[in-house]
């Protein structure tokens, strides 16, 4: 992971042959937009862990800047993301200034965000010459930064551990654990394969302290006989590998409810002090 591109982009050499050059070019474009105010660009998520599935996974990035983005930079980033993020390679990126990164707070404040879920609002804002209102904080950033430290990559700029402070375990767990069985079940119904695999990943972390990908979590749960419903977990893994992670049809409601109940109880016990 040490090869560098013309602007010092690194961490690309073991990525899929078509994605590495594409990502290098995109990071270079980010650097040109931010200029001297750039602290770094960081990759986390499935592309960093080697479990990226085309048509299902996002390219997950964090952008670190010295100061908040200017109005011109926001416009340039919006236009860049509307052009470069595609259904084949969807980008999710959050930009955080130094004041938003340190001291650490949860939920974490951020400066700017783009994902495909924001595409329509961003496109509408471009047409109107306005900027869409975004939340001031994002609780998911505790999970993103934790995964960056554990399994992510510095693509450009400061090392990740210099750009981002460590995230307390309690904040990470608060960002990823459903508050109750009903909330967990709602996630499973909305995205069954994603929800089942994510529960396996959280179970692996809670029991072993290791942060893995969704695929790694499922394989651990099956190998250690920790999956409440092994057949359900295997189906979720197959759906994930096939790029069918968001398919909602044909899942047994009773099995999803049992999965939500058993994982919620176990994770609640494991995340408690001394668990």
Task: Specify the residue positions occupied by each region the protein language model found.
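Helical scaffold of the NTase/Pol beta-like nucleotidyltransferase catalytic core
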Residues: 1-42, 72-73, 275
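Conserved NTP/Mg2+-binding pocket subregion across the NTase superfamily
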Residues: 2-12, 79-187, 196
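Glycine- and acidic
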Residues: 7-13, 63, 242-247
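Charged catalytic carboxylate motif
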Residues: 22-25, 76, 198, 259
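Catalytic metal-binding acidic patch
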Residues: 41-79, 90-97
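Short, solvent-exposed loop/turn segments at secondary-structure junctions
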Residues: 48, 100-101, 201-204
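Conserved nucleotidyltransferase catalytic core and NTase-mimicking acidic/glycine-rich helix/loop elements
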Residues: 132-275
């Amino acid at each position: 992971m040490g090869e560098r591109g013309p602007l010092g982009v690194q961490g690309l050499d073991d990525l899929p042959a078509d994605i590495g050059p594409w990502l290098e070019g995109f990071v270079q474009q980010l650097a040109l937009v931010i200029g001297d105010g750039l602290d770094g660009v960081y990759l986390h998520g499935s592309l960093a862990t080697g479990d990226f599935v085309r048509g299902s996974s996002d390219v997950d990035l964090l952008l670190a800047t010295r100061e908040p983005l200017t109005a011109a930079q926001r416009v340039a980033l919006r236009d860049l993301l509307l052009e470069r993020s595609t259904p084949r390679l969807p980008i999710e990126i959050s930009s955080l200034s130094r004041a938003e990164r340190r001291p650490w707070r949860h939920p974490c404040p951020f400066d700017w965000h783009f994902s495909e879920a924001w595409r329509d609002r961003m496109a509408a804002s471009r047409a109107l010459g306005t900027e869409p209102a975004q939340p001031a904080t994002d609780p998911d950033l505790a999970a993103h930064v934790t995964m960056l430290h554990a399994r992510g990559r510095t693509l450009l700029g400061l090392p990740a551990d210099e750009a981002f402070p460590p995230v307390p375990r309690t904040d990470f767990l608060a960002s990823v654990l459903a508050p109750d069985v009903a909330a967990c079940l709602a996630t499973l119904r909305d995205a069954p394969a994603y929800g089942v695999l994510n529960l396996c990943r959280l179970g692996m972390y809670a029991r072993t302290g290791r942060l893995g990908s969704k695929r790694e979590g499922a394989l651990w749960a099956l190998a250690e006989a920790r999956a409440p419903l092994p057949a359900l977990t295997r189906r979720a893994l197959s759906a994930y590998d096939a790029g069918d992670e968001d398919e909602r049809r044909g899942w047994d409601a009773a099995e999803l409810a049992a999965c939500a109940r058993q994982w919620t109880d176990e994770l609640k016990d494991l995340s408690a002090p001394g668990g």
